């Protein structure tokens, strides 16, 4: 596994904002030529065309992270959002360095849950039901921050994707009676509904209310 502290960004964008598109493309091509096979450039499907054209690999975030970890590249440059580069770093070899060109590139859905909110929810569950580790399996969607993935690991939970979420819920319910799913309530509720759980039995925790 890579070290999440290995994710870097050293780009000063002000230096490039004034460049004409043609100049920017020339700079990119020159950098690619210098780095050669030492770097692999990953572009998520959502990237704009003038970035996408330079990609070595394209696809969804998990696919790209897996492919990058299998490469011999020293530098993994992920043109995507923050959690994508974190996943690439988690899956990377120890000697690989994951680089996110813009550390401000975020995902509004991933930001719907953060560690402080999840830990607060866990404490409230403890106040209401006793030991949450005995009753709840925490499940996070892969589109989430690395610290939420770590929280799930520390509490006997798991990470899911959109395609395996129903199977992950089956796994979770086989171990404990209840599931705490985040950050995407809609994926969690859809997966639960697919398992036959009535919607009125799936509670949405509200961080703005006492005891959610």
Task: Give the positions of each predicted feature.
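Active-site loop-to-helix "anion-binding N-cap" substructures in soluble metabolic enzymes
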Residues: 2-212
């Amino acid at each position: 596994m890579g070290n999440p502290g290995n994710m870097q960004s050293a780009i000063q964008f002000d230096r490039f904002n004034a460049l004409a598109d043609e100049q920017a493309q020339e700079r990119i091509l020159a950098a690619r030529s210098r780095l050669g096979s030492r770097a692999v450039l990953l572009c998520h499907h959502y990237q704009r065309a003038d970035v996408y054209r330079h990609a070595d690999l394209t696809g969804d975030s998990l696919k790209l992270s897996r492919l990058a970890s299998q490469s011999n590249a020293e530098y993994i440059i992920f043109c995507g959002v923050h959690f994508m580069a974190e996943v690439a770093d988690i899956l990377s070899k120890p000697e690989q360095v994951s680089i996110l060109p813009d550390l401000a590139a975020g995902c509004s859905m991933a930001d719907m849950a953060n560690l402080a909110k999840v830990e607060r929810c866990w404490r409230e569950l403890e106040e209401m039901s006793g030991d949450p580790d005995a009753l709840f399996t925490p499940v996070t969607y892969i589109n989430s921050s690395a610290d939420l993935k770590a929280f799930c690991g520390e509490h006997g939970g798991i990470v899911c994707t959109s395609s395996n979420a129903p199977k992950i819920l089956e796994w979770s319910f086989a171990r404990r009676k209840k599931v705490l799913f985040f950050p995407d309530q809609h994926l969690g509720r859809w997966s639960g509904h697919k398992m036959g759980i009535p919607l009125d039995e799936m509670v949405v925790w509200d961080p703005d209310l006492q005891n959610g």
